[in-house]
Amino acid sequence: MRLSVKAPAKINLSLDVLYKRPDGYHEVKMVMTTIDLADRIELIPLPGEDAIRVVSQNRFVPDDSRNLAYQAAQLLKETFSIREGVAISITKHIPVAAGLAGGSSDAAATLRGLNKLWKLGLSVHELAELGAQIGSDVAFCVYGGTAVATGRGEIITPISSPPPCWVVLAKPPIGVSTAEVYRNLQLEHVNHPDVDAMVGAIEQQDYAAICRSVGNVLEEVTLKKYPEVAHIKEQMRRFGADAVLMSGSGPTVFGLIEHDSRMQRVYNGLRGFCDQVFAVRLLGERHSLD
């Protein structure tokens, strides 16, 4: 039996870093939501083999233990003494190293899919706990939908989904090191977003308040070092997005837009100078294990 699983990207509507913890991680508080830009994971049993094979049409996707989907399969095999092999085919649509949790979502989709393929019977909560061992964003990606993430990002509290709107994303042709961004973050000199205000706006389904409440403390570092990201933000505002923010540590910038005609204007304007531009919708529902 082959199994196909969708692996949607996420954006951060609000991202705050509170302090650096004794274990070296940063304590964060953020609101994340999934969007309808997704990779496709296909899981293919390998009868008679006890191996994990990863293939992708994208040459930037590693095919070994550096790949988070590979790590997800390896973790399940080791934890539950699975002696079955699997091929993991990853069709990439989410840009790589973009601040959209593409690798984490691939890992989460692999966990959900192998839970079914190998008949492990794990709950979403149990899968998320396993996912947190792989990476901070994997736990959220197991759940999907919209949630507040705390701790180092692995403590997930699901909340209501925002009202439907367009999300236009633009990724400049640069890579940003998340570790470097956190290293250069000076918490005493940044403006901290009001994450609770974002949660309240979502619960009230108040689109205007959501747009007013977007914020990302990591912009303070990335925008200074990468003027291309700041330029995309400026242009997205100029073309008419209702709210504009960098996702994660960057470099992808997204705009929230309510109306179709304005979305088209923003999308077309950005396509004039940026190769990787996407117009997608927010995804309201959480993942099901069915």
UniProtKB/Swiss-Prot annotation:
Gene3D superfamilies: 3.30.230.10, GHMP kinase, C-terminal domain. The keyword Acetylation does not apply. GO terms for molecular function: 4-(cytidine 5'-diphospho)-2-C-methyl-D-erythritol kinase activity; ATP binding. Coiled coil: none annotated. The active site is at 10, 137. It holds the Pfam family GHMP_kinases_N. This is 4-diphosphocytidyl-2-C-methyl-D-erythritol kinase. It comes from Geobacillus thermodenitrificans (strain NG80-2).
